[in-house]
């Protein structure tokens, strides 16, 4: 039952945002009583925490799947961007914005997990890019991976880039181009320019 609650809560939180969904909404959606809901979770914050980590785990698996299917690391970067953007809707309902604003402690916990899980994937992609001649062979993999993940954190920080002033899709695309241009070889640049051109046409 607890796993079913987390799965349903995760879906609703993604669709409507963490603040918007109440425990009453969750009980109704699951066709259970609030008493049953509170038997598994002491309060909404506990459920938000478990749901957030459930979603994060799903995102990591999705990124791993993309990584294994992508033809090369540049394609991987842009495919991951598209996958991640679905969690950034408008300012009122975006689960990421609401988590950062209303549950900053949980948001910080998730950020701490990023290095452990995503850092390994990023470093693997950088190594593949070097071995295939798309990324410069002299880049410092540890430095670049940390810089990349910190940059991704930065563009998602609503204190630095308020949603009312900055479009998340544009931020992602600008940052990806900034990151990739710093590490690609001439061969990689040709492929990168194709992806940028295709993105501009959409």
Q: Where in this protein do the model-derived segments appear?
A:
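Secondary-structure edge/capping motif, primarily at the C-terminal ends of alpha-helices
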Residues: 66, 95-99, 159-162
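Short secondary-structure transition hinges
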Residues: 89-124, 131-135, 139, 143
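Helix-turn-helix
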Residues: 4, 8, 12-46, 50
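Short, basic, alpha-helical segments at the C-terminal edge of helix-turn-helix-like DNA-binding modules
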Residues: 52-60
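C-terminal peripheral helix-coil segments that are non-catalytic and often amphipathic
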Residues: 124-128, 132, 165-202
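Hydrophobic alpha-helical connector segments
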Residues: 50, 64-94, 145-148
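All-alpha amphipathic helical-bundle segments outside canonical DNA-binding/catalytic cores
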Residues: 75, 113, 131-147, 165-170, ...
């Amino acid at each position: 039952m607890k796993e079913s609650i987390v799965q349903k809560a995760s879906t609703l939180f993604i669709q409507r945002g963490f603040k918007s969904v109440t425990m009453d909404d969750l009980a109704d959606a699951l066709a259970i009583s609030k008493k049953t809901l509170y038997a598994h979770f002491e309060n909404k914050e506990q459920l938000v925490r478990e749901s957030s980590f459930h979603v994060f785990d799903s995102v990591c698996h999705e990124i791993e799947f993309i990584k294994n299917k992508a033809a090369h690391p540049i394609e991987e970067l842009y495919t991951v961007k598209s996958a991640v953007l679905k969690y950034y809707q408008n300012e009122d309902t975006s689960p990421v914005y609401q988590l950062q604003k209303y549950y900053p402690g949980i948001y910080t916990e998730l950020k701490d997990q990023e290095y452990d899980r995503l850092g390994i994937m990023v470093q693997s992609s950088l190594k593949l890019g070097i071995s295939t001649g798309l990324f410069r062979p002299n880049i410092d993999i540890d430095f670049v991976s940390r810089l990349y993940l910190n940059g991704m954190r930065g563009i998602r920080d609503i204190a630095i880039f308020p949603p009312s002033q900055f479009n998340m899709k544009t931020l992602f695309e600008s940052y990806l181009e900034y990151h990739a241009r710093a590490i690609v070889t001439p061969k990689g640049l040709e492929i990168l320019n194709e992806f940028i051109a295709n993105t501009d046409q959409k």
